[in-house]
Amino acid sequence: MSRPKPIHNAQPEQVFIESLDTEGRGIARVEGKVLFVDGALPGERVWARRTQNHKSFDRAELLQVDKASSLRVSPPCPHFGVCGGCSLQHLEPAAQVAIKQRQLEDHLWRIGKVRPERVLPPIHGPSLGYRSKARLSVRTPKTRGAMVGFRERNSSYVVDMGQCLTLDPRVGQRILSLRTLIGQMQSPQDFPQIEVAATPDAVALVFRHMRPLAESDLQHLRAFGEQHDLQIWLQPRGPETLYPLWPEQPEPLHYDLPDYRLRLRFDPLVFTQVNQAANQVMVRRAMALLQPQPGEHILDLFCGLGNFTLPIARLGAQVLGIEGDARLVALAAENAAANGLADKARYAVADLTQARMEDFAPAGAIDKMLIDPPRSGAIEVLRSLTPGVRRLVYVSCNPATLARDAEYLVHERGYRLRAAGVVNMFPHTAHVESIALFER
């Protein structure tokens, strides 16, 4: 791929915005070439200036909105437009969801040549203060004090921010305090990032550090944790070196799925859904689509901690969860035992980009399946789909790979796309999470 060429001293031009791309940028067409305009909305006529030239498209900065969309709103965050954490705060929240639903359906048809028989109502959660997981960057420029937050849009610089409205407020309202804390360290440049993991009962901050810490640094960190009622964890090298600093024996982090009388424990660095309110509704939706029954044998691929495995087991089915991360599998097994479901839920470690279904599920042994793959999708394991799987629920974080996999399932394996809809897991961002039901 050729590198973009910067455009200097381009003249402003008036353009009409047709739609949004998958990163939340406005799309215009000028003399047959696509122009991406940050901050512009569909239906708007704007003045823009080109900043980058690519072979098939150009990028532009928004200068002025001549005709504003009726869906344009004032962003609640003063850092919007600079911060790369959000891209859609200027769009009315209900319209954000409608655009994501349209993008999902467009991808399914354009890439997969398939349309859902039923469009599911969107799943919502809170739009502010919802982020329970995040990675905050840390920088210490010579001209300013320590910077803590998200990176600037299209840049490696960290935003000069004092708060974050989408983060859990126990962290989002303490950005300035975190900046002060980093500034007190003997070598603040040795802290590249802070991981956030929040639950209703506790918040853990994981400080990644490049060199051994001085005793004064440890004292500052302990005092910060005690003052703000936060768990402080340290990670000197890889994830396996993670350990708690304050308190020395913290209460385990957990989240609940009350509909299924479940409590799932986890470590601060492992994957959990970022929006727990939306996750609870998504799990409920997945169970309604999958309809686990006692006596059925169900496969849960990319199972993680057991977010779907354990509800399936609670509803009476026998379920096998497969995951590539051995630490997640160990936690999932612990969660099954802690919830009294060790006889219903079993787990195994496998690289699902390489494994075949018959490696862990003989032909005819599986009645239904749920998959929750990463952005790359699940085409490798789907190609080895064994006969007998009559119902498949697909939870996706990338509509493009969902559409690709849907094309294979529908046009080559004889499934029907019974239903599909979006999950607004990341409000104010262009991220499209979705859930789909396939049957044959």
From Swiss-Prot:
Annotated binding of S-adenosyl-L-methionine, by residue: 273, 302, 307, 323, 351, 372
Family: Belongs to the class I-like SAM-binding methyltransferase superfamily. RNA M5U methyltransferase family. RlmD subfamily.
GO biological process: rRNA base methylation
Gene (UniProt): rlmD
Record EC number: 2.1.1.190
Protein name as catalogued: 23S rRNA (uracil(1939)-C(5))-methyltransferase RlmD
Reactions it catalyzes: uridine(1939) in 23S rRNA + S-adenosyl-L-methionine = 5-methyluridine(1939) in 23S rRNA + S-adenosyl-L-homocysteine + H(+)
Annotated InterPro entries: 23S_rRNA_MeTrfase_RlmD, MeTrfase_TrmA_AS, MeTrfase_TrmA_CS, NA-bd_OB-fold, SAM-dependent_MTases_sf, TRAM_dom, U5_MeTrfase_fam
Binding-site positions, [4Fe-4S] cluster: 77, 83, 86, 164
Annotated organism of origin: Acidithiobacillus ferrooxidans (strain ATCC 23270 / DSM 14882 / CIP 104768 / NCIMB 8455) (Ferrobacillus ferrooxidans (strain ATCC 23270))
Alphabetic keyword roster: 4Fe-4S, Iron, Iron-sulfur, Metal-binding, Methyltransferase, rRNA processing, S-adenosyl-L-methionine, Transferase
Top-level EC class: transferase
